[in-house]
């Protein structure tokens, strides 16, 4: 485990608790009083682990208000990105259970927050409103009237069932920008099907390509990539729509299907099939356009990635192996010859890497400028000088837990760097603040709404 001095500002660590301690509810104050505030990041600017731009300078999206009414990641992650660059994000949750992501992932000492929630629900205020009740819908529309962006990811038709169709929302706020993320998009014959990242990976063709030839397709990693990718496209759409709104004063609707966001990044599989009828198949860790191009195990049981995509790169690898003859035109110096002798070239690489430790392989390849990298575990990353020098980790104080290390803000902007102001908030931590200060609702009325479980 990494030393705390390199990763945190104290020795405090999140408390391990059993899965049974994570529940679907959060205690709500018995009166109209606001719950305690959210945590702030406090590393000094010189700390390489700190978030860029931890001062109070105005960020580019300051003054933009975002309503995030989705669950999990597909869509809400776009709100996280906007929040990192100054937008105010109001997370609308059901009063009893909140976002189900609060209960997914590694448990913490807080019964309403897993580590996944803390990391990915960053830079938000939690506001509890029951959208299944008419008074809740009325409150929600008041928030919409005072906001710039709305993000939702329910199954198509759900918002309409609650009386929150796009025409209703647009009439409430003509300048509203609405991002709708769903498994299959808002139109088409499959629009009402449930959609999660795993299903989107399969439907889009990504899972078909993951694994080794002739074997069972595997998950492309353990992270819900589709949710993140769809959110990134959604965030791009929001920024484009904001620019359009600056020019015209009008908002617009943004529709992203998770599957199509994944499909969009699968390089040339569509034109290859459309023109030549070629179906891309699983390649394991390899590539159909280059060899050696894969993962190789070293003598000490560790792994490296080597990617020789050009003849020059292979020439450098041959020099690193101290076998320059391999790159001769008569052997494997030409890419077409290497591809034709794929198994032989891979076996040569396997044997060479297997005769050395990973550090030795890395040193020899780097000396010859061969594209090479270690297959890092998270423990490796916590101790890697480049991760630390780039400030890729942020140490944030989480209420009731202590310091938590999370991925830092991406992208890095020179003049207006983003920041992590707080981790996933306690359920309803800003309900009173938002209703009282933004909507000018009296404390007595807030108390009544709470007693009726509308908030």
UniProtKB/Swiss-Prot annotation:
It comes from Chloroflexus aurantiacus (strain ATCC 29366 / DSM 635 / J-10-fl). Its EC number is 2.8.3.22. Forms a large complex composed of six heterodimers (alpha, beta). Keywords: Carbon dioxide fixation, Transferase. Involved in the 3-hydroxypropionate cycle used for autotrophic carbon dioxide fixation. Catalyzes the transfer of CoA moiety from succinyl-CoA to L-malate to yield L-malyl-CoA. One of its GO terms (molecular function) is CoA-transferase activity. SUPFAM superfamilies: CoA-transferase family III (CaiB/BaiF). This is Succinyl-CoA--L-malate CoA-transferase alpha subunit. The active site is at residue 227. GO terms for biological process: carbon fixation by 3-hydroxypropionate cycle.
């Amino acid at each position: 485990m990494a030393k705390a001095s390199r990763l945190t500002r104290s020795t405090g660590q999140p408390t391990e608790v059993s899965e049974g301690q994570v529940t679907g509810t959060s205690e709500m104050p018995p009166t109209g009083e606001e719950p305690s505030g959210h945590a702030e990041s406090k590393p000094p600017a010189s700390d390489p682990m700190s978030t860029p731009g931890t001062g109070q300078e105005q960020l580019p999206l300051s003054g933009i208000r975002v309503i995030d009414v989705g669950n999990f990641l597909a869509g809400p992650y776009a709100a996280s990105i906007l929040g990192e660059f100054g937008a105010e994000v109001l997370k609308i949750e059901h009063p009893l259970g909140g976002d189900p992501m609060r209960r997914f992932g590694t448990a913490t000492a807080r019964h309403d927050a897993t580590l996944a929630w803390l990391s990915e629900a960053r830079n938000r205020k939690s506001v509890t409103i029951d959208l299944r009740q008419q008074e809740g819908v009325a409150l929600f529309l008041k928030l919409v009237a005072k906001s710039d962006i709305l993000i939702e990811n329910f199954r198509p038709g759900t918002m309409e069932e609650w009386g929150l169709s796009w025409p209703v929302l647009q009439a409430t706020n003509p300048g509203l920008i609405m991002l709708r993320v769903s498994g299959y998009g808002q139109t088409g014959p499959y629009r009402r099907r449930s959609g999660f990242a795993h299903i989107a990976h399969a439907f889009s063709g990504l899972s078909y390509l993951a694994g080794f030839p002739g074997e069972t397709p595997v998950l492309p990693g353990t992270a819900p990539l589709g949710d993140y990718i769809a959110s990134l496209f959604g965030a791009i759409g929001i920024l484009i729509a904001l620019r359009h709104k600056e020019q015209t004063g009008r908002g617009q609707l943004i529709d992203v299907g998770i599957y199509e966001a994944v499909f969009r990044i699968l390089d040339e599989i569509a034109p290859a099939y459309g023109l030549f009828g070629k179906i891309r198949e699983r390649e394991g860790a390899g590539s159909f356009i280059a060899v050696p191009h894969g993962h190789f195990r070293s003598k000490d049981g560790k792994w490296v990635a080597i990617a020789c995509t050009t003849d020059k790169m292979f020439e450098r690898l041959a020099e690193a192996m101290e076998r320059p003859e391999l790159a001769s035109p008569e052997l494997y110096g030409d890419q077409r010859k290497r591809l034709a002798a794929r198994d032989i070239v891979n076996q040569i690489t396997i044997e060479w890497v297997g005769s050395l430790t990973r550090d030795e392989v890395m040193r020899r390849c780097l000396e010859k400028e061969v594209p090479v990298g270690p297959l890092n575990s998270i423990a490796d990353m916590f101790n890697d000088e480049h991760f630390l020098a780039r400030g890729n980790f942020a140490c944030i104080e989480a209420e009731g837990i202590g310091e938590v290390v999370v991925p830092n803000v991406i992208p890095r902007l020179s003049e207006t760097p983003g920041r992590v102001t707080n981790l996933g908030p306690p359920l309803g931590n800003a309900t009173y603040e938002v209703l009282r200060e933004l909507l000018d609702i009296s404390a007595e009325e807030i108390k009544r709404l709470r007693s009726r479980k509308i908030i």
